Amino acid sequence: MKKALILTGNFVQDHEFIYPFYRLLEEEFEVSVGINENTKVKGILGTDIPPNKNHPILNIEEIDVNDFNLLILPGGVKSMEKVRQNKTIIKLISEFNKQEKTIGCICSGVQLLISAKVVKNRKI
């Protein structure tokens, strides 16, 4: 089964999380969620993240990049200001890049790529 990881934090831009979350499920991905705060949070517009109340949240410290095929980094300026300060998340992004796995960014999610220093000599 294909596995995707969405990394985010409090005040993510709601639709930038919700749309890829449900589209990946529709495409039969197993979708895991890693949240900077390691707990359910709210999107900037008030949506519960993750939206399904029983959807598990992975502990950031325990995520193994080898378990995933795809990484999604949704935006939300307020969220990314905090998430990009989490050294573990930045290391995870660097490892996804090192293993040449697909990384999808939406809007200000690209800030995480900059913090992980994986944008040099690339078109974003």
Question: Which residues are covered by each model-predicted region?
Answer:
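Catalytic nucleophile serine of serine hydrolases
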Residues: 107
